[in-house]
């Protein structure tokens, strides 16, 4: 999210300037290649999927791959810099014997394959657990890459849209925020923030879903009284979605 913030600052304040603003974004992108950032996946994959696969991008793990893909796509969109399109320009290294070479094209190809290879057209963060919010980053990675390189993301967009309506929308129009991709069951309740943060990430590919979800939130969650905006806060909304704990400073 740090890279997104710097990119938004560049886009809204200094669109003609690259310099250290672009350098800061590159640093954030390349920091993701540090083993301390990505080595967790080999162990999560082992206990969660009973599979030894140290490569952090090949399957699942959209909490790394999707977010990272958007970082690269946003950087290229703003700066016209195609360095990350070169083969091997984004290589994960753990010592001299363990390497996983990638580039923006390969990352986007993996996002497309993981999305279309899932019956939900979404794929897990943690093993088995699918979040529409996280998979929206994979969707946007494909959209960004194809816009910059002349591809067509239509199959991914339509698959995501259909699955969102079919598998991740409650009868009242609110979001099913978490579903188990292996067993199919959903976690019935979820914090409102899951819907709020999803809206802007739906907008590039499926704007009709973004508008519908935002309208429902305004009608059902937000109480507009005069000049005040008062969200309806439930106990569940006090959970910090980063560590799944209650905390008095969660909404400070």
State where each predicted segment sits:
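Extended ligand-binding clefts on enzyme/binding-domain cores
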Residues: 62, 92-103, 117-251
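Extended ligand-binding groove/face enriched in aromatic
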Residues: 5-130, 135-136, 174-176
């Amino acid at each position: 999210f740090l890279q997104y913030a710097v990119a938004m600052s560049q886009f809204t304040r200094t669109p003609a300037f690259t310099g250290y603003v672009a350098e800061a974004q590159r640093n954030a992108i390349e920091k993701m290649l540090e083993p301390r950032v990505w080595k967790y996946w080999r162990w999560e994959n082992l206990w969660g999927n009973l599979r030894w696969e140290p490569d952090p991008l090949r399957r699942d793990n959209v909490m790394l791959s999707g977010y990272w893909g958007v970082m690269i796509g946003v950087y290229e969109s703003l700066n016209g810099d195609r360095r990350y399109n070169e083969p091997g320009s984004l290589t994960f290294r753990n010592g001299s014997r363990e390497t996983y070479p990638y580039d923006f094209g390969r990352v986007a190809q993996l996002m497309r394959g993981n999305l279309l290879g899932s019956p939900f057209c979404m794929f897990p963060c943690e093993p088995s657990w699918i979040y529409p919010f996280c998979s929206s980053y994979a969707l946007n990675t494909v959209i960004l890459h194809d816009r910059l390189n002349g591809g067509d993301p239509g199959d991914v967009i339509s698959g995501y849209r259909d699955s969102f309506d079919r598998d991740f929308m409650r009868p009242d129009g609110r979001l099913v925020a978490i579903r188990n991709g292996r067993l199919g069951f959903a976690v019935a309740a979820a914090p409102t923030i899951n819907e709020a943060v999803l809206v802007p990430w739906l907008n590039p590919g499926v704007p009709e879903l973004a508008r519908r979800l935002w309208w429902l939130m305004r009608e059902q969650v937000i109480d507009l009284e005069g000049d005040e905006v008062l969200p309806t806060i439930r106990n569940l909304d006090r959970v910090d979605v980063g560590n799944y704990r209650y905390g008095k400073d969660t909404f400070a």
